[in-house]
Amino acid sequence: MNMHVDMGRALTVRDWPALEALAKTMPADAGARAMTDDDLRAAGVDRRVPEQKLGAAIDEFASLRLPDRIDGRFVDGRRANLTVFDDARVAVRGHARAQRNLLERLETELLGGTLDTAGDEGGIQPDPILQGLVDVIGQGKSDIDAYATIVEGLTKYFQSVADVMSKLQDYISAKDDKNMKIDGGKIKALIQQVIDHLPTMQLPKGADIARWRKELGDAVSISDSGVVTINPDKLIKMRDSLPPDGTVWDTARYQAWNTAFSGQKDNIQNDVQTLVEKYSHQNSNFDNLVKVLSGAISTLTDTAKSYLQI
């Protein structure tokens, strides 16, 4: 099938499998000077950086543990290195900025040059594919902004929970060789602070709310105006499982509580990990989109120049 037609159909409906296939074959097409992975990295768009930083944040969160009594011996919990989460947010923000800059470069340098060639030098009508490229680029910018905002917000939330889990070490201790003391009231207050200050995110104007609700699932809720709010249910379960200050539990009861409490922490981790996987998929889609866009613009520019030479 004509590559022109393939590109037009894939770009118009944002058919990601088709775009991926085109991105793989386009560099071999003599008429399409598509960007390569090396070109993307040279432009500062290297998806490996934010994804590695987010992976490090997930690993750091997973390594957190509460104090426990094992074989009659009290074992301290493990605190988090919170700077790992800051690093992840900075990487996500920087990657989004590089992605947006690249799209704007395509829009101003490549797409603008194509329009000038087609329109100013003879008044021919641009290819129908060209007419939709600006809209495709605009939608790409919107998706970048939305994902960066949401991933940054979820990472901040992740960090807040990690901070609480670290501070729990200060309120759980061994009463004696058979019992554990837990100041649950103080821990409740810490969790409530997280609930009261959950980050909210705003989707870009004109975002497809239904699509984003389906994309993000029940880890968040999205209002009709595009405000994204983190679902606090898991934190509420953690908070409500806690006893009053000064409570003493035997080892068996404490370990049962610890298992349930840590299970909710793991559920939060799963929510964030799922979003990070979707973010990774979105980055892959972006790379393929840019490769196809650059190839399409290159092809259309050559077509317009050939027309003018007739």
Curated annotation (Swiss-Prot):
<comment type="function">
    <text>Required for invasion of epithelial cells, as well as for survival within host cells, escape from endocytic vesicles and subsequent actin-tail formation. Probably regulates the secretion of effectors BipB and BipC and their final integration into the target cell membrane.</text>
</comment>
<keyword id="KW-0843">Virulence</keyword>
<dbReference type="InterPro" id="IPR009483">
    <property type="entry name" value="IpaD/BipD/SipD"/>
</dbReference>
<dbReference type="InterPro" id="IPR036708">
    <property type="entry name" value="BipD-like_sf"/>
</dbReference>
<dbReference type="GO" id="GO:0005576">
    <property type="term" value="C:extracellular region"/>
</dbReference>
<dbReference type="Pfam" id="PF06511">
    <property type="entry name" value="T3SS_TC"/>
</dbReference>
<protein>
    <recommendedName>
        <fullName>Translocator protein BipD</fullName>
    </recommendedName>
</protein>
<feature type="coiled-coil region">
    <location>
        <begin position="127"/>
        <end position="171"/>
    </location>
</feature>
<comment type="similarity">
    <text>Belongs to the invasin protein D family.</text>
</comment>
<keyword id="KW-0175">Coiled coil</keyword>
<feature type="coiled-coil region">
    <location>
        <begin position="250"/>
        <end position="299"/>
    </location>
</feature>
<keyword id="KW-0964">Secreted</keyword>
